[in-house]
Amino acid sequence: MKENNKKTGLSVRSVVATGIGAAVFFILMKYIAIPTGVPNTNVNVAEGWLALIAGLFGPVVGFLVGVIGHTITDATYGAPWWSWVLADGVFGLLLGLSKRFLDLEGGDLSTKKLVQFNVWQIIANVIAWLIVAPIGDILIYKQPASKVFLQGAAATIVNILSVAIIGSILLVAYVKSRPKKSSLRSE
């Protein structure tokens, strides 16, 4: 009988990262939310954290951290708003696709990679907050289009800024804390 050595599911490291990532995401989203003036839309520093977690662990962990963290946060206010929970999951998934070109574990984050990441996060924000969230609000909750697209536009702008500032700082700080692949030599 031939044994199948193919890995399935998430690694222990990814499961732990998901749990810790979602817990920190919840704390940041719940307790460090800055109102924008648009109803139910805040400057969300948790999105900067999601950029680091997704960039380190990839799209599956990014998706799970966004969905779990947002669901728990919404549950503390009464009930999850599923269209925005899904949008956060999509955002985490899209940010996680940056793992390949960022290579944060390698200890080298060039200006070019950081610019590429920020261009990608702008695209990911537009998809999540100007497409997924408003269309979900219309389809699931029968919300007026003018309201939800205003909320989506505000969320897009503030989340782009949150990830560009907080996310970039976290990415750079993480890489500076890691040895470069070429810095260790055997003797």
Curated annotation (Swiss-Prot):
NCBIfam families from the xrefs?
Answer: PRK13661.1
Q: Entry's Pfam families?
A: ECF-ribofla_trS
Answer yes or no on keyword Chaperone: no
Upper lineage is: Bacteria, Bacillati, Bacillota, Bacilli, Lactobacillales
The similarity annotation says:
Belongs to the UPF0397 family.
| UniProt keywords, alphabetically | Cell membrane, Membrane, Transmembrane, Transmembrane helix
Q: Would you tell me the protein name for this molecule?
A: UPF0397 protein LEUM_1974
- Main location as per UniProt: membrane
Q: Give the membrane topology, semicolon-separated if more than one.
A: Multi-pass membrane protein
Which InterPro entries would you find in this protein's record?
Answer: ECF_substrate-spec-like, UPF0397
Q: Which Gene3D superfamilies match?
A: 1.10.1760.20
